[in-house]
């Protein structure tokens, strides 16, 4: 995913600032009739302007203009090279009234006739490893690499130079050191600012080589970036997203298998934790067998009225409550190994290793939470309003071998698809629900009798 955005971090720096860059500067004035009056030259050092002499003007109203030595003064017009590496500055005052014999103080805001752009490469949870920006340049956009301006800094025409930009240093800045976390962090590598013509709107090519999420990355593509506005800052972001699941580790952090280190994966993340105050969710790696209930009484137990459709069931995210809060009959099902085996076994699931304090209690997931697991592998999947509540196949865009590999590669010994009818804590009317990975591009879901023995995946919050 690629975006071009205003660079709010750099907006305060878009103007030349104080002090302005050292160098040679020239100041002239234009009277109300449009006649130019040459004035001062001087040097800027550490924000202090030292003129080469003094300047007297007849009384009148003038617009004052200041340019640095990167701007060529042709007498009746100005010329500036807008390619990377140049930094022309033009400052134009508001009209000033000069009354002799008094001194006049004129201030300038020095502006770039160029735009500034940074390139940023974004990853999540884990930073790009040892990125190398091999090159960054462009197809030459004809003519706009330089420009002619009138004496007040207004652009007149293109200067005939191609708008090729380069980033010779290849320097990339990481926003924060890598630290495994339970929160999905954003890591960025960013270039320094690059100056370019605001009319520059051709394709910009970049080549970045690195490793990320356990894969070698070599991205060499073109993107549209313009047109831009002069004296504005932009940031072009390229976002690298992980196509594989994130894993919950025993120490309460998440990440890819490639950076597991000494950590042990205990689950697949089905809902990311986006801030410290947020709550993430993961599913266990291994299936458990049990029945929803051992008494065939077909009661509404969770909430009254109970969901009546697949769509309503998919909106239920309360598996933890159905496991640990008293049901409508006043029973905490997590505490009932005989009557509610699935709830009890889910609540007592053991991932096989000690876990951190931020990992909560395991529970029997709701139907909606199970759909979140499906969406880990098919982000476009959503239940249909016309789906039957009775056992049926629904279409998804999932290769089941990929699902199985996601579990097996993390140490699971369970066969995840093709057979297990994974029980959920949600009821439709008075019947339990289930949802299962079945075959390529196919799920199998619906309602079942409450005494049906089947398998399920415990879930946990972190």
Language model regions located:
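Extracellular structured ligand-interaction cores
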Residues: 22-24, 61, 105, 114-116, ...
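Residues within well-ordered beta-strands of beta-sheet-rich folds
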Residues: 65-67, 118-120, 282-284, 363, ...
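Short aromatic-cysteine micro-motif
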Residues: 272-363, 367-380
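Short consensus segments that form the blades of beta-propeller domains
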Residues: 14-19, 353-356, 448
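Sec-type signal peptide cleavage vicinity
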Residues: 1-247, 297-303, 308-324
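C-terminal, surface-exposed recognition/capping segments
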Residues: 368-462
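Short, flexible beta-strand-to-coil junctions
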Residues: 30-34, 67-72, 124-126, 209-213, ...
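GGW-centered surface loops in extracellular recognition modules
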Residues: 232-290
């Amino acid at each position: 995913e690629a975006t071009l955005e205003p660079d709010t971090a750099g907006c305060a720096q878009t103007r030349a600032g104080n002090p302005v860059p050292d160098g040679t500067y020239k100041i002239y004035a234009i009277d109300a009739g449009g006649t130019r009056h040459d004035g001062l030259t001087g040097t800027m050092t550490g924000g202090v302007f030292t003129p080469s002499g003094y300047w007297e003007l007849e009384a009148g109203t003038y617009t004052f203009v200041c340019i640095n030595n990167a701007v060529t003064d042709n007498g009746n017009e100005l010329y500036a090279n807008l390619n990377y590496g140049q930094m022309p500055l033009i400052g134009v005052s508001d009209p000033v009234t000069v009354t002799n014999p008094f001194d006049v103080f004129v201030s300038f805001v020095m502006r770039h006739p160029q735009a500034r752009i940074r390139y940023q490469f974004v990853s999540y949870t884990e930073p790009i490893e040892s990125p190398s920006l091999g090159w960054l340049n462009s197809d030459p956009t004809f003519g706009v690499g330089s420009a002619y301006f009138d004496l007040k800094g207004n652009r007149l025409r293109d200067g005939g130079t191609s708008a090729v930009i380069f980033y010779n240093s290849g320097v990339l800045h990481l926003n924060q050191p890598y630290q495994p976390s339970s929160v999905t962090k954003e890591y960025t590598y960013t270039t320094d600012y690059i100056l370019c013509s605001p009319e520059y709107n051709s394709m910009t090519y970049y080549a970045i080589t690195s490793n990320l999420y356990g894969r070698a990355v070599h991205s060499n593509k073109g993107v549209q970036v313009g047109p831009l506005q002069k004296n504005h800052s932009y940031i072009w972001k390229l976002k690298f997203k992980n196509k594989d699941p994130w894993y919950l580790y025993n120490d309460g952090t998440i990440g890819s298998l490639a950076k597991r280190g000494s950590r042990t994966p205990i689950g697949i993340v089905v809902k990311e934790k986006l801030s410290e105050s947020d709550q993430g969710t993961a599913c266990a790696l291994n299936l458990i067998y049990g029945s929803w209930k051992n008494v065939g009484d077909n009661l509404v137990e969770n909430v009254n009225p109970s969901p009546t459709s697949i769509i309503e069931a998919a909106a239920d995210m309360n598996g933890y409550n159905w496991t640990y809060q008293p049901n409508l009959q006043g029973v905490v099902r997590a505490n009932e190994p005989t009557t509610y085996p699935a709830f009890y076994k889910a609540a007592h699931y053991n991932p096989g290793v000690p876990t951190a304090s931020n990992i909560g209690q395991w529970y029997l997931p709701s139907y909606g939470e199970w759909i979140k697991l499906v969406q880990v592998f098919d982000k476009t999947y959503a239940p249909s309003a016309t789906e039957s509540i009775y056992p049926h196949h629904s279409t998804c865009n999932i290769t089941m071998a990929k699902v199985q590999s996601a579990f097996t590669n993390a140490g699971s010994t369970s066969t995840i698809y093709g057979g297990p009818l994974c029980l959920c804590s949600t009821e439709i009317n008075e019947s339990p629900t289930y949802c299962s990975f079945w075959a390529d591009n196919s799920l199998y879901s619906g309602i079942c009798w409450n005494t049906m023995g089947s398998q399920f995946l415990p879930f946990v919050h972190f």
